[in-house]
From Swiss-Prot:
Protein name as annotated: Aspartate carbamoyltransferase regulatory chain
Lineage: Archaea, Thermoproteota, Thermoprotei, Thermoproteales, Thermoproteaceae
Known role: Involved in allosteric regulation of aspartate carbamoyltransferase.
Gene: pyrI
A Gene Ontology molecular function term of the record: metal ion binding
Known partners and oligomeric status: Contains catalytic and regulatory chains.
Length: 151
């Protein structure tokens, strides 16, 4: 394996590393990143990793994620590591943790849940009931959701 950089370093922003292979697009989706924001975004998928075998990496230039955004990433990428970059250096590094509450990011998979009724302005809300592996429960219908249900 070569030690050359696949994607250049960023001056400032956020690097999301150790994303399970194939989940980077789901991370971008839950963060609401479309590519039209006007900031440079680098996406590398299926690169070799000692810890995961294969992994994805996302670099977002000139944007630091909020704590809420960081923790929501754990719903689709529980092994992710967040690196905050300033002046080409990592100034903070931490792992994501599942949030206690998720509001409005995912749809309940129960077709009869009130959050799926077209005339009901109810925001889907999920509560964390287990951290490892993450398990959430819908606040309205009580249906349990694992990661594969929410992605």
């Amino acid at each position: 394996m070569s030690r050359e950089l696949i994607v250049s370093k960023i001056r400032s922003g956020t690097v999301i590393d150790h994303i399970p292979a194939g989940r980077a697009l789901a991370v971008l989706r839950i963060l609401g990143i479309t590519g039209k924001e006007g900031v440079r975004i680098a996406l590398v998928m299926n690169v070799e990793s000692k810890k995961l075998g294969k992994k994805d990496i996302i670099k977002i230039e000139d944007r630091e994620l909020t704590p809420e955004e960081v923790n929501i990433i754990s719903a689709v990428a529980p092994t992710a590591t967040i690196n905050i970059i300033e002046d080409f250096r990592v100034v903070r590094k931490f792992k994501v943790t599942p949030p206690e509450v998720i509001r409005g990011k995912f749809k309940c998979r129960n077709p009869t849940c009130i959050t799926n009724a077209p005339r009901e302005p109810v925001e889907p809300t999920f509560y964390l009931v287990r951290r490892e592996p993450p398990l959430f429960i819908c606040a309205y219908c009580g249906r349990y959701h694992e990661l594969s249900d929410l992605i």
